[in-house]
From Swiss-Prot:
This is Isocitrate dehydrogenase kinase/phosphatase. Signal peptide: none annotated. One of its GO terms (biological process) is tricarboxylic acid cycle. Keywords: ATP-binding, Cytoplasm, Glyoxylate bypass, Hydrolase, Kinase, Nucleotide-binding, Protein phosphatase, Serine/threonine-protein kinase, Transferase, Tricarboxylic acid cycle.
Amino acid sequence: MSHFPKLLSSQIAYDVARTMLDGFDKHYRLFREVSHQAKLKFEAGDWHGLQQIQRDRIAFYNERVRESSVILEDEYDAENIEDEIWQQIKLHYIGLLTNHHQPELAETFFNSVCTRILHRSYFNNDFIFVRPAISTEYIENEESPTRPTFRAYYPGSREGMAACFERIVHNFQLERPFEDLQRDIGYVVRAVGEHFGDLRIAPNFQIHTLSSLFFRNKAAFIIGRILNGDRTFPLAIPILHGPSGKLVLDTVLLKKEQLLILFSFTHSYFMVDMEIPSAYVTFLRDIMPRKPRAEIYTSLGLQKQGKNLFYRDFLHHLQHSSDKFIVAPGIRGLVMLVFTLPSYPYVFKVIRDVFPAPKETTRELVKSKYQLVKQHDRVGRMADTLEYSDVAFPLSRFDEALVREFEQHAPSMIEYQRAKDGGEEIVVRHVYIERRMTPLNIYLQEGSDAQVEHGVIEYGNAIKELIAANIFPGDMLYKNFGVTRHGRVVFYDYDEIEYLTDCNIRHVPQPRNEEEEMSGEVWYTVRPHDIFPETFRTFLLGDPRVGAAFLRHHADFFDPAMWQSHKDRLLAGHVHDFFAYHASDRFIHRYGAAAEPPATPPVKQPDAGPARRVA
């Protein structure tokens, strides 16, 4: 039950609330500035610059939380503020958010500052936002009506499809010229027509596109939806730099599955300029209704809001379930203690206290590897992780075998405490949370011949894309990779990753005598960061079905020259192109660079005649 005061009588309470909101506003101003820079760097083809601002942005939030906490400590002795004043601080903050355009993000920022200042055993739910206090429904940008969240276009009543898409592209005002926009628009219209076929045009037929481009890797994406009758279809158009150096429309994505992969947890976060982020999330949920809001916020670079929503969803699931957390099935890891809740599609990973041989690492080194992945381009091949500290679980929901695992292998990472309802809790001091996937080793063991073929192709492609992005996985056993629900192979064990450019790629030396040739041990010198691709055969080709498929599709995997060529390109400053869609979907492959799209007349107003094609 809440015990808020009836009167807000403290000037300090208002000043603290104002200081905290000023800290958030500064954070979000800098966050949006990165999106402005992303557009300029995309237009200039400054790929290294894009990567740098993406990395820098990840640290912005914690820097502003730290900065605000220091100000509050120095100016208001915040740690010693009385409970009644903290309650007034929250109420003043709510008042300040009444007409704010990012209230949900500001509430999360308030929680971050509050929990940084106060120990978890001290702050209570009256001090922080356990649930949203300000609605994000129907927030409009009334100050700048020319910058709506999305723009609506009516191809059936005005310009026709080709003119409509041309206007959509021009409205983003990209400074770099297009190679041949008329050609590419023709491809878009042709692809839309092929996808929808004989679709009757309804009176409300229209196209909506979000007002800002989505920047990631070397692409800028137009994201939208097509409305026709009571149906909504997703729309995404990636814009790339073509071989000529000018811009091209690379494809058009029109399936929900394609958008889900584009916004997958295996990709880096987008850079998007959003005045009202909740409106963007609502729009994206409309075209991806299965996507949790937490994941959408995270994919937009608002990972702290994603963490906040994920934790709320998790607590809600705990309240409405009764199964127990168990040790995750499968091969036990040497670095991580992994557990899961069978009814929840995630795994929880805790760093062990001691690492048995042959592992040689430390807790801090493992954490640094996970942070490296957070900051690096994951290219659709590395799972994102949510990192939490001091998470309290009901002890009654922990299987006894799991408790024993903790007490034996990670006792320093847990403590027990009494919950406010009188029950016992187990507090996990540090945990990573990842999407649960089918381990690749199990997928290959139990799969059909076609599934084995698919798994091997995906595994090889995943490794090649990772090394093209300057990531050497280190431990490449199949058990360290998972298969997503879309059939993509993803890496998720990061404790041994290195930059490929830091590695020495070597041939196995020729034995100098019979004793070396017959030796069961490695007889040649191996230094840190040495890689011997020829030796990968030993642990990758053991299963006959897997081995045969591997040699059919990735025989170059065991050739040091393949690995060295990637390293050389990276050292020369090359930034690889990565696509979150199949190569066969690209216009250059689908229609051919020189193919002339068919002439497409404008779509007419709907009438009582027979069904017509969209294009």
